């Protein structure tokens, strides 16, 4: 599987570890930057690049990394069609795939040991999308909002 990766300085070392792990696992990691350590770099360009390439390649996944994974997830989700979940455990990585058909996850490089992060990555890349109708319905609602910017009706709301 192709896996696009983007990180800033805070996720740079972990990204290198993940790339090596993915290669050893038979995957095709594609580095979208940062390409060298720069303590003053900014995450948006790297995360948007990884998300753009992931969305354009339907059979791929993506991983964005920074200090917490929060800003990186936000940046990736600015790309139309991207569904990036913050994964902080094996379970959240699995649920991102099963329930949300997330194509990307954000991981905090300062939040996990290398072993923990690799377990999250493995869970993400090996967990299939459930294709459950209730989950697809929710994805469709979000896609329609993204397309039209018209919020769905709030069930039970008056007026």
From Swiss-Prot:
It holds the Pfam family LacAB_rpiB. It comes from the Bacteria. The keyword Repeat does not apply. One of its GO terms (biological process) is pentose-phosphate shunt, non-oxidative branch. It catalyses: aldehydo-D-ribose 5-phosphate = D-ribulose 5-phosphate. Pathway: Carbohydrate degradation; pentose phosphate pathway; D-ribose 5-phosphate from D-ribulose 5-phosphate (non-oxidative stage): step 1/1. D-ribulose 5-phosphate binds at residues 8-9, 67-71, 100, 110, 134, 138. Its EC number is 5.3.1.6. One of its GO terms (molecular function) is ribose-5-phosphate isomerase activity. It is an enzyme of class 5 (isomerase). Coiled coil: none annotated. Keywords: Carbohydrate metabolism, Isomerase. SUPFAM superfamilies: Ribose/Galactose isomerase RpiB/AlsB (SSF89623). The active site is at 72 (proton acceptor), 99 (proton donor). Catalyzes the interconversion of ribulose-5-P and ribose-5-P. Belongs to the LacAB/RpiB family. In mycobacterial enzymes, the usual proton acceptor is not a cysteine, but is remplaced by a glutamate. NCBIfam families: PRK05571.1 (NF004051), RPI_actino (TIGR02133), rpiB_lacA_lacB (TIGR00689). PANTHER family: DNA DAMAGE-REPAIR_TOLERATION PROTEIN DRT102 (PTHR30345:SF0), RIBOSE-5-PHOSPHATE ISOMERASE B (PTHR30345). Homodimer. This is Ribose-5-phosphate isomerase B. It comes from Mycolicibacterium paratuberculosis (strain ATCC BAA-968 / K-10) (Mycobacterium paratuberculosis). The lineage of its organism: Bacteria, Bacillati, Actinomycetota, Actinomycetes, Mycobacteriales. The gene is rpiB.
């Amino acid at each position: 599987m192709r896996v696009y990766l983007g990180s800033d300085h805070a996720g740079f070392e972990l990204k290198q570890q993940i790339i090596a792990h993915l290669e050893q696992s038979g995957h095709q990691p594609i580095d979208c930057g940062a390409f060298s350590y720069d303590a003053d770099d900014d995450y948006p360009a790297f995360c948007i690049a990884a998300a753009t390439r992931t969305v354009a390649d339907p059979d791929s996944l993506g991983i964005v990394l920074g200090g917490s994974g929060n800003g990186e997830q936000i940046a990736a989700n600015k790309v139309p069609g991207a569904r990036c979940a913050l994964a902080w455990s094996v379970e959240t990585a699995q649920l991102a795939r099963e329930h949300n058909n997330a194509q990307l996850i954000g991981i905090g490089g300062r939040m996990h040991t290398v072993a923990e992060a690799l377990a999250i990555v493995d869970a993400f890349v090996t967990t299939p999308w459930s294709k459950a109708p209730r989950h697809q319905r929710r994805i469709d609602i979000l896609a329609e909002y993204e397309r039209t910017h018209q919020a769905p009706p709030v069930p039970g709301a008056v007026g």
